[in-house]
């Protein structure tokens, strides 16, 4: 009898817990976004998770589930992180790359993304760290002291609490994805998730694109790409190599900064994120003026401002913020795609992610690295040098992969890692080549090489 009472009491506790979780979920449900198409079928949620009570740090998320026709209960969960550092996953990942909606030029209405990755997985976008997008801290100094370590630690706390709010995703296949400076965020968070071994988080691996991996090899590849594509002179190439290559991208020397400035002048008014794409002149000029203020000059361009005008209009709308349960504290500044303060004051940035790659490769996790081949900010050359430094055993030859009879890019499979390039894509691969990015993601989830 006592045992039955104990079991009944335990059942009541579980029932209460499930009811609380469901209530928290429903508070975050998005019923309608201003300007959305009439035929939206999938469920989506957004809101805040507090990651540090004493400092008042809370991170904003947006979950877009797979449509009912795709059986979302059977689909994995994928966390997407954008880099910068200091740039929003809502602005870039969700609104112009892999999310279900794109924003029209009027900044008020939305249209469907035919190659949205939520057709293949449930997508969780996180604005991180605090101070980015709608994520906030009640401790002002947090915005000036953000760095790699705290970003990873806060993201892990977010995940643990988010899985409590959405318990139906516990034990579901879980992956982490991202691009650019998320080449730090993704492996660092992956390392914590792997080492913590939380039974609720069924972590399987990660995928990163045009990723910052290793300062030395990234520098070598960056300067080589500029020179080989005729963007800089022989003299500037020489000066960059002797002044920058053995330094930190986060804390460059004055000589390195001077060489970077010379390279910038020689490159002229191009779009560095996609060197064959026409620029938007006003924003490019404003971006160039930021160069002298940042401490990591080769990453000074964080993300292309030419593509973020529409998102700035949309996500600053009070009606949109209300629908998304965003800006609930009344931030003293407008929502922006990238936070200048967070990016410029970045505190800690390890020189290399290669030791983490080695640890997670040895652990047997699925790891894919992809690169758009027209990006001159974090180009394919640096990525290839970094991967070569891992000294992995090749399992396939370097081969062209097929996209409807055309070369979609090139790939090579190694023991523990797959490298893929996307032909004709810039820094934000899904923005420039959405179909090819979709095929890439599908192959990653299926754990199959891209087709020859």
Curated annotation (Swiss-Prot):
Annotated EC: 3.4.16.-
Q: In which tissues is it expressed?
A: Ubiquitous.
Detail the disulphide connectivity of this chain as listed in its UniProt entry. Answer: 87-338, 244-256, 280-306
| Key word Glycoprotein present | yes
Question: Which keywords does UniProt give here?
Answer: Carboxypeptidase, Disulfide bond, Glycoprotein, Hydrolase, Protease, Secreted, Signal
Output the Gene Ontology terms for molecular function. serine-type carboxypeptidase activity
Q: Which Pfam families match?
A: Peptidase_S10
Could you name the domain of life of the organism this protein comes from? Eukaryota
Q: Which residues are glycosylated?
A: 52, 138, 327
Q: What is the active site of this protein?
A: 180, 375, 427
Tell me where the signal peptide lies: 1-20
KW Cell cycle (keyword) present: no
Q: Where in the cell is it found?
A: Secreted
Q: Single Gene Ontology BP term?
A: proteolysis
Where does the chain cross the membrane? Answer: none
Q: Which terms in the GO cellular component ontology are assigned?
A: endoplasmic reticulum; extracellular region; plant-type vacuole; secretory vesicle; vacuole
Q: Its family?
A: Belongs to the peptidase S10 family.
State its role.
Probable carboxypeptidase.
Report the protein name in the record: Serine carboxypeptidase-like 26
């Amino acid at each position: 009898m006592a045992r039955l009472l104990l079991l009944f009491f335990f059942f009541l506790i579980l029932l209460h817990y499930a009811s609380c979780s469901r209530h928290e979920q429903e508070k975050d449900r998005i019923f309608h976004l201003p300007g959305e198409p009439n035929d939206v079928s999938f469920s989506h949620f957004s809101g805040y998770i507090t990651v540090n009570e004493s400092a008042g740090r809370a991170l904003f998320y947006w979950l877009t589930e797979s449509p009912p026709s795709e059986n979302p209960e059977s689909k994995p969960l994928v966390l997407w992180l954008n880099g910068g550092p200091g740039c929003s996953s809502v602005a870039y990942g969700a609104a112009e790359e892999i999310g279900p909606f794109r924003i029209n030029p009027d900044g008020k209405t939305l249209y469907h993304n035919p190659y949205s990755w939520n057709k293949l997985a449930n997508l969780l976008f996180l604005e991180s760290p605090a101070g980015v997008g709608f994520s906030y801290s009640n401790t002002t100094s947090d915005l000036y002291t953000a760095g790699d370590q705290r970003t990873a630690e806060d993201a892990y706390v977010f995940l643990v609490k988010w899985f409590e709010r959405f318990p139906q995703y516990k034990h579901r296949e879980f992956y982490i994805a991202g691009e650019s400076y998320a080449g730090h965020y993704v492996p660092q968070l992956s390392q914590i998730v792997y080492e913590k071994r939380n039974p609720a988080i069924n972590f399987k691996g990660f995928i990163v694109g045009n990723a910052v991996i290793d300062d030395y090899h990234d520098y070598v590849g960056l300067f080589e790409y500029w020179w080989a594509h005729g963007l800089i002179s022989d003299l500037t190439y020489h000066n960059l190599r002797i002044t920058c290559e053995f330094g930190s991208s986060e804390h460059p020397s004055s000589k390195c900064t001077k060489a970077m400035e010379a390279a910038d002048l020689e490159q002229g008014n191009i779009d560095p994120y996609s060197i064959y794409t026409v620029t938007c002149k006003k924003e490019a000029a404003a971006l160039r003026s930021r160069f002298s203020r940042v401490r990591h000059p080769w990453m000074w361009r964080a993300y292309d401002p030419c593509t973020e005008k529409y998102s700035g209009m949309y996500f600053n709308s009070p009606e949109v913020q209300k629908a998304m349960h965003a800006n609930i504290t009344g931030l003293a500044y407008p929502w922006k795609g990238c936070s200048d303060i967070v990016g410029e004051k970045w505190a800690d940035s390890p020189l290399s992610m290669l030791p983490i790659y080695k640890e997670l490769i040895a652990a047997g996790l699925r790891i894919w690295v992809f690169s758009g081949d027209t990006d001159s900010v974090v180009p394919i050359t640096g990525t290839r040098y970094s991967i070569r430094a891992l000294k992995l055993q090749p399992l396939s030859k370097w081969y062209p992969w097929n996209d409807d009879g055309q070369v979609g890019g090139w790939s090579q499979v190694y023991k523990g890692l797959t490298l893929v390039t996307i032909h004709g894509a810039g820094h934000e691969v899904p923005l420039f080549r959405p179909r090819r990015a979709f095929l890439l993601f599908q192959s990653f989830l299926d754990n199959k090489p891209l087709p020859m």
